[in-house]
Amino acid sequence: MNKSQGSVSFTDVTVDFTQEEWEQLDPSQRILYMDVMLENYSNLLSVEVWKADDQMERDHRNPDEQARQFLILKNQTPIEERGDLFGRALNLNTDFVSLRQVPYKYDLYEKTLKYNSDLLNSNRSYAGKQTDECNEFGKALLYLKQEKTHGGVEYSEYNKGGKALSHKAAIFKHQKIKNLVQPFICTYCDKAFSFKSLLISHKRIHTGEKPYECNVCKKTFSHKANLIKHQRIHTGEKPFECPECGKAFTHQSNLIVHQRAHMEKKPYECSECGKTFAQKFELTTHQRIHTGERPYECNECAKTFFKKSNLIIHQKIHTGEKRYECSECGKSFIQNSQLIIHMRTHTGEKPYECTECGKTFSQRSTLRLHLRIHTGEKPYECSECGKAFSRKSRLSVHQRVHIGEKP
């Protein structure tokens, strides 16, 4: 096939993000994007994608002059007139530039270029203008400075002022790109990162540094993103809404878990009782009911718990921390859920209704107790005489009869 036909530009294989969309990507998503874009760029270099400009067959100007003429922006402004917009020679050792940020478009300014795999061989010299390499890949220019030129040929590269420099245009071998992807190494654990900022963030795992503080409760975080998520507890913001039922959540992860309920996806099954769960950690926590394991222990009173969250709540008994305050009466509570229930004493709200008799209650737990009147359930049995009760408090009162205490 003629190489001037069926040409491929980088635009055909890239994905664009707006600045707002880019900022919303988490570090792992940005790394994935970077890897894919570099992979595509490398692949384009390994196939015949060169596009010739027939008009340049008749153009015999100096290559540098031609470069200044044909390295143009989409609005046809010569690159020299754009100054700092071009930026700098990009160095993959220190940075990665999103392939959408610099909207350059440039065409080949030489005669028809015969693709040759030897272009990727840095040990081979090339003669004359046929070796001037200017690959058309659309949206970004990636350059790598080389210490030496080949066969006296001058290769064009542009700095902030748009001046031509005597360096070879960036033609990367696939492996070389891979080596440059993660140049930042953690001195504690040797883990490698693509960005210096990710390395700095990672090191906080080792140092324990938590530079981001909540201005409401003074809790600190190692990452700014975690602080932003935490602050939704105070603001009540729930930006993630279920399209099925409209229920909103503070975190996207909670929405994903919730949506599994609609899809009835509960892939994790308990081998003891057959109960299924949407997440593996839920199964792990549930299995402690069967094993009796309580791995979370209070360092104040040695009480143990199935869940870490229950331990955290319990520890507030010892610290006396009650950060949730009622705006009506000033009473404070350890948990936000306790405050919500308390507020119903002021509003009179009773959202839990008995399906048998229509009686309403302010708390779900009270409704459960009430339902035992209709079902006749009495789960609390006296070990001495076998008498059963619907409430634990009534069993406790009854047991005093056996030990001789006055009720």
Swiss-Prot record:
It comes from the Eukaryota. InterPro entries: KRAB, KRAB_dom_sf, Znf_C2H2_sf, Znf_C2H2_type. Its main location: nucleus. Pfam families: KRAB, zf-C2H2. GO terms for cellular component: nucleus. Residues 8-83 form the KRAB domain. Residues 171-404 are annotated as: Does not affect nuclear localization pattern. Keywords: DNA-binding, Isopeptide bond, Metal-binding, Nucleus, Repeat, Transcription, Transcription regulation, Ubl conjugation, Zinc, Zinc-finger. This is Zinc finger protein 1 homolog. CDD domains: KRAB_A-box. GO terms for molecular function: DNA-binding transcription factor activity, RNA polymerase II-specific; RNA polymerase II transcription regulatory region sequence-specific DNA binding; zinc ion binding. A zinc finger (C2H2-type) spans 184-206, 212-234, 240-262, 268-290, 296-318, 324-346, 352-374, 380-402. Gene3D superfamilies: 6.10.140.140, Classic Zinc Finger. The keyword Membrane does not apply. It is found in: Nucleus. There is a cross-link at K74, K114, K145 (Glycyl lysine isopeptide (Lys-Gly) (interchain with G-Cter in SUMO2)). Residues 2-167 are annotated as: Required for correct nuclear localization and exclusion from the nucleoli. PROSITE patterns: KRAB (PS50805), ZINC_FINGER_C2H2_1 (PS00028), ZINC_FINGER_C2H2_2 (PS50157). May be involved in transcriptional regulation. The keyword NAD does not apply. Belongs to the krueppel C2H2-type zinc-finger protein family.
